[in-house]
Amino acid sequence: MDNKIKTIFLCIVFLVIGIGAGYGFEYEFSYQQTKHLIKNIVPVRENNFNYHYIYPLLRYDFGNAKYFLEDKNLEEKINAYIQQQYQAQNAESISVYFSNLSAGTWSGVNADTSYIPGSIMKVLIMMAYYRESQLDSSIMAKNLVYTDQVNQAVSKIPYVNPVNLTVGQSYSTKYLLEDMIENSDDAADTLLLLNVNQSILDDVFGDLKVTVPGTTSNYTISPKDYTSFLRILYNATYITEVDSEEALSILSKSTYHDGIYAGVPSGVEVAQKYGESLDVDPQTKEVTATYLHNCGIVYAKAYPYTLCIMTKAKGLTDHKQQAAIIKDISAMVYKYVNSGSGK
């Protein structure tokens, strides 16, 4: 009997030791894993060496920790819709990136796929001028003349938007920025580009870790990368708080009311930019693909969020089907957000 008791006692002791050791190992593994994740959360700072005492912060890169913030439920809904559109041959490629600006949760479907951006890059030109205004406050009032030479250059741009400028007339930089963003006026864009401080514009691209378009052919960007510009404006971490507020106010006055804007209820503010572009065969001059993108911040009642949708269709299209796809995804995301999900 005594031997049996001893045996039972020893078994219990070894069991307790085993459980303790297992718990200790699990704790140590969990601790090391958590430590690794935390170490991978790193600040992304301005690529600016003009300062001696400061190193301005733009945002944080969450590394592998970001996967704990991934909203897979929304992702699955978006992906199911995209697959339906592929089956119906309504688009060749669709990419979406969503980010909750309050809680940091995100969803992405083909979010790292890159596209020819078109006019959505006008936002960076605006940021460059606001950046320059911090050095020279008179820049916004400076008048620029819309010449016939500029008008000739504008007429050669594919998908050129209605030009609101008159040859021979002068316009303030501030007016041109508003026209470029609100109406996506390519004339205003061209005139601003010809007069921008190129060094500051290059710095903007460098600071935001984006390749300068002129340094590469077939320039492309992904929805995920583009969203970082919107987040930086929202957080006011690159240009001043006053300028960031003003820039987003201009974006909220966009006259483009298809896409994301059409997918949310009337009265919901959307600070957004859209862009169109084409792929053209260099030999035959035939249009092989049409691009339509729409990216912005939706100020939903539940919480503000970024949504960037990029689309590519085969051949030359009128954008209607692509705009409908963007609208549908926007409506889906808005409904999901305001149902209390994704917090």
Where in the sequence are the language-model features?
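Active-site-adjacent helix/loop patches that line small-molecule binding or acyl-intermediate pockets
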Residues: 58-74, 146-253
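Short, conserved catalytic-motif segment at the N-terminal edge
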Residues: 90-114
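Short glycine/serine- and small hydrophobic-enriched flexible loop segments
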Residues: 127-135, 182, 228-235, 331-335
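Active-site Gly/Thr loop motif
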Residues: 259-289
